[in-house]
Amino acid sequence: RQRQMCIRDSVRIAFIREKIINHFNINPSDENPFNKISLLDVGCGGGLLCEPMSKLGANVTGIDIVEKNIKTASAHAEENKLPIKYQVNTVEELATKKTKYDVILNMEVIEHVSDVSLFIKSCSHLLSKDGIMIFASLNRTLTSYGLAIIGVEYILGWLPRGTHDWNKFITPDELKVLFKSNQLKICLLYTSDAADE
């Protein structure tokens, strides 16, 4: 499982890096290419995405509602001398402040929130005018039920049973409506289980 997670994370990091570089027309050969980028990682967990973004020079803030995750992430960042700002917080609470971010990473979080509309609205308030939000979620299909719930939770036991509620998974069409109602433009939409839609 550890090796699979590392491969998945390295692919994800490369994808995020490429999208940020293209969006802001950054020279990838610069020593700290993201040094003018403010980045928010929503549901940052242990900081697996925050740390590589910080190493690229971004001014990184990571938020999570689980205090244990923030403590783990903070300790690891301190150990590696990375100036990442971690806090126990929600996007809904953070959106009440005046802070804006050039980049928001929103990876597999929406399927765990109770008010999806408020969540997307809060994210849109936090995103700077010319910013980019990179979003990943589980599509509500039979494939996702089989893989994310039956496979990961029940057969492999990688996550505790009940971690995911299939009814809270979101379809691309539902996501499009939410984004449009919050003046968020979709630049790229990719789904890996298109045969199930």
Residue ranges and their predicted role:
Residues Q2-D9, Y190-E197:
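Conserved small/polar residues in nucleotide/adenosyl-binding loops
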Residues R8, T141-T163, S192:
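Alpha-helical membrane-targeting segments
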Residues R8-N35:
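Conserved alpha-helix/loop element of class I SAM-dependent methyltransferases that forms part
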Residues I20, F24, A77, F179:
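Conserved hydrophobic residues forming the short capping helix/wall of the S-adenosyl-L-methionine
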Residues N27-Y145, P172:
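Conserved SAM-binding loop
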Residues S137, G157-E174:
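Acceptor-substrate binding/catalytic loop of class I
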Residues N167-N182, L189:
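Short alpha-helix
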